[in-house]
């Protein structure tokens, strides 16, 4: 009996798809035969890695053939063998992304005919050692109908077959995103639940406290708390002088060191010292998930580790409930308007970062959209304003959990909601204080800006509104934010973080509405004389109010650069003064919301437009802006800003004046002002040497978006902040009371 012309056996394993093939040829009436066996082994992964960011190109596939008297093969058979070889091998390149850790790369080859999604997952687990991180997503690089590259999720064997068929030439590019699950111990593995976890921590307590005292940088909340503390106690930690900026930063707070700030029950026992430590060097990326909740005042005081875990789970369930109530809280028209407005900003927020890369309907972008929509629906007095997506984006990326991120976002918005109020008072105060600080720190530079017509500092609007989030690369911005938050005093909620805001008050919004139907208005500041489209795309005011079933109004505002006009009004800028500073503008209003929401691709990103140069002239406007007396601090600056000057006369040097105390300065966030000052001073010489006018100066800083050097800015800001705290040049009755001996 003759054997078959070709025998074939296939075996399948989790990491090594295997195919063996044997063939035999028999000659009629001839006593000899030849048999050949071809063995192909495809190993599931290749351990070479390319840490520089490139893909390793060496394949782990190997072929071996053993033959005894191989059969003759013709040219057609050879071509068929090559074609079959191409069908049997798909080269794969994989990039693993895990939070903010450096990406890892692997390269291997698989047989598409016998490689299922389950087999591929086993290969990736072995390749990247993912045994403890089973919750990960796989996506492959493909091209959409327009030819744009995008990552598509691999959710089934059918998806994998499609990837092999359409996206494997010359190789299949995969991305693995690690996502810890909600109940994974990775979320809270640094929370102490058992006392045995902190054995020996008391031994380190005295040593840690001593080292913090001797090397401490200025710490704001030591002043802000005002509970039985005097300035002399604050000065005990001010051991770093202005000239010592060459000292390196302390290393980021580690997991082990964080445990020393907790007691035997896992409660945070030294919140002030923890913030001071973070002010020194930031937090390790793997620790941010928990530490940021303290910095954003999410946890009530005194929670143990187990109580914190239960608290976050409960608040997450509360968020999911609120998310399901959108339709009950707003009418369909307003809800659709809110969602579309939020979506336009979400789709352009941090898309270059791996966490938000991928298709527009990706899970992270969808989570950011739902988070912001829920906030707008549940906080009608604030609603949604452009820029909020920039504040929520880093929080969601760090928490990697939609519900937890929403709780933290509510925590930070408790402090920053005033930035987005339509009356512009909060932003006007911050501008006034930054102007006062620059005038105090560098009179010559301030005088130069006055002569250039740039002393209003409106090109810094994005800095103050978003607390400099866009001025640094994403990872640097995370560190800058946590250092800034650590300079603020602890303010834990008395009971829990409130996830629902007060109802809307239409009378307080400053916008009218027609009875019985929504009224939406769009306001733009445009130059009176065609000076380059001053605020044409950069300043958009959008309002929407409607009467809901309960009779309460609802307001949605877009593009917070609209606050520039309110800032001018609140800061007492008269129109004749605006003309001399080349700020002629007319207000164009009552445009329908059916028009595009934003003309600029990213209004907050560009503030370089200016109506005219300082040398141009415009007829004075007859329309007066009513000044506001709402700024409580820095009245000398307000008097100086509100009065016109003769452009032909030299600007006299400003007289020395004090600065507000920390609890008032920058509306309670003074360190943010010093960061802004540090950025200005970093570029002072370049600006003055090249004689930049307002437009050139604003464009200069627009080009530096996400490019500022965090190390230099932090060192300079901390040194200036130390001088401020030591100088006691505080001009406020409250400040005088705070510095009085107790």
Swiss-Prot record:
A single BP term in Gene Ontology: autophagy
GO cellular component: autophagosome; cytoplasmic vesicle
Alphabetized InterPro entries for the sequence: Rab-GAP-TBC_dom, Rab-GAP_TBC_sf
Residues recorded as bearing Phosphoserine in the entry: 194, 560
Keywords: Autophagy, Cytoplasm, Cytoplasmic vesicle, GTPase activation, Phosphoprotein
Keyword hit for Phosphoprotein: yes
Chief place where the protein resides: cytoplasm
Pro residues compositional bias, start-end: 649-663
Name of the protein: TBC1 domain family member 25
Gene assigned in the entry: Tbc1d25
């Amino acid at each position: 009996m003759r054997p078959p012309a070709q025998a074939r056996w296939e075996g399948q394993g989790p990491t090594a798809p295997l195919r063996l093939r044997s063939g035999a040829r028999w000659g009629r009436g001839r006593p000899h035969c030849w048999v050949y066996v071809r063995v192909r082994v495809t190993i599931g992964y290749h351990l070479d890695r390319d840490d520089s960011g490139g893909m390793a190109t060496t394949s782990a596939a190997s072929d071996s053939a053993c033959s005894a008297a191989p059969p003759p093969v013709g040219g057609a058979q050879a071509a068929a063998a090559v074609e079959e070889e191409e069908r049997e091998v798909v080269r794969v390149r994989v990039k693993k992304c895990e939070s903010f850790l450096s990406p890892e790369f692997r390269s291997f080859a698989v047989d598409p005919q016998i490689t299922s999604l389950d087999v591929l997952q086993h290969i990736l687990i072995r390749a990247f050692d993912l045994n403890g991180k089973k919750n990960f997503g796989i996506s492959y690089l493909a091209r959409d109908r327009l030819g744009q590259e995008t990552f598509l999720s691999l959710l089934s064997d059918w998806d994998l077959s499609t990837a092999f068929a359409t996206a494997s030439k010359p190789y299949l590019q995969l991305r693995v995103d690690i996502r810890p699950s909600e109940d994974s111990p990775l979320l809270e593995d640094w929370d102490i639940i058992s006392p045995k976890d902190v054995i020996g921590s008391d031994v380190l307590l005295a040593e840690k406290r001593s080292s913090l005292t001797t090397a401490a940088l200025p710490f704001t909340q030591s002043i802000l708390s005002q509970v039985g503390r005097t300035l002399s106690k604050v000065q005990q930690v001010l051991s770093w002088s202005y000239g010592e900026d060459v000292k390196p930063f302390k290393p980021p707070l580690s997991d082990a060191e964080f445990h020393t700030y907790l007691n035997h029950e896992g409660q945070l026992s030294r919140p002030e010292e923890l913030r001071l430590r973070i002010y020194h060097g930031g937090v390790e990326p793997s620790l941010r998930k928990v530490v940021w909740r303290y910095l954003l005042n999410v946890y009530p005081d005194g929670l143990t580790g187990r109580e914190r875990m239960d608290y976050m789970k409960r608040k997450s369930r509360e968020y999911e409930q609120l998310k399901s109530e959108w339709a009950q809280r707003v009418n369909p028209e307003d809800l659709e308007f809110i969602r579309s407005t939020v979506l336009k900003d979400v789709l352009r927020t941090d898309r270059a970062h791996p966490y938000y890369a991928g298709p527009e309907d990706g899970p992270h972008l969808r989570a950011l959209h739902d988070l912001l929509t829920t906030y707008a629906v549940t906080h009608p007095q604030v609603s949604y304003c452009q820029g909020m997506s920039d504040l929520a984006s880093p929080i969601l990326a760090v928490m990697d959990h939609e519900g937890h991120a929403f709780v933290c976002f509510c925590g930070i918005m408790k402090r920053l909601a005033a930035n987005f109020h339509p009356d512009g008072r909060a932003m006007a105060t911050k501008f006034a204080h930054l102007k006062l600080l620059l005038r105090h720190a560098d009179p010559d530079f301030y005088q130069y800006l006055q002569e250039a017509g740039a002393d209003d500092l409106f090109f810094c609007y994005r800095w103050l509104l978003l607390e400099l989030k866009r001025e640094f690369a994403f990872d640097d911005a995370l560190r800058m934010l946590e250092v800034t938050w650590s300079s603020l005093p602890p303010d834990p909620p008395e009971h829990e973080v409130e996830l629902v805001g007060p109802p809307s008050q239409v009378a307080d919004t400053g916008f009218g509405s027609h009875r019985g139907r929504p009224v939406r208005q769009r306001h733009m500041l445009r130059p009176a004389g065609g000076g380059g489209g001053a605020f044409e795309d950069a300043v958009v005011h959008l309002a929407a109010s409607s009467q809901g079933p309960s009779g309460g109004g609802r307001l949605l505002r877009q593009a917070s650069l609209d606050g520039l006009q309110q800032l001018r009004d609140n800061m007492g800028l008269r129109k004749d003064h605006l003309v001399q500073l080349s700020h002629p503008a007319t207000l164009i209003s009552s445009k329908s919301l059916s028009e595009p929401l934003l003309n600029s691709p990213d209004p907050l990103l560009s503030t370089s437009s200016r109506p005219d140069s300082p040398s141009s002239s415009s007829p004075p406007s007859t329309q007066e802006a009513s000044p506001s007396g709402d700024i409580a601090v820095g009245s000398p600056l307000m008097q100086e800003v509100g009065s016109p000057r003769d452009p032909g006369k030299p600007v006299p040097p400003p007289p020395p004046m004090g600065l507000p105390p920390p609890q008032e300065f920058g509306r309670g966030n003074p360190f943010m002002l010093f960061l802004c000052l540090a950025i200005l001073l970093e570029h002072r010489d370049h600006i003055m040497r090249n004689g930049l006018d307002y437009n050139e100066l604003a464009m200069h800083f627009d080009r530096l978006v996400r490019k500022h050097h965090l190390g230099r800015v932090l060192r300079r800001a901390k040194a200036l902040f130390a001088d401020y705290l030591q100088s006691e040049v505080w001009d406020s009755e409250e400040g005088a009371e705070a510095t009085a001996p107790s």
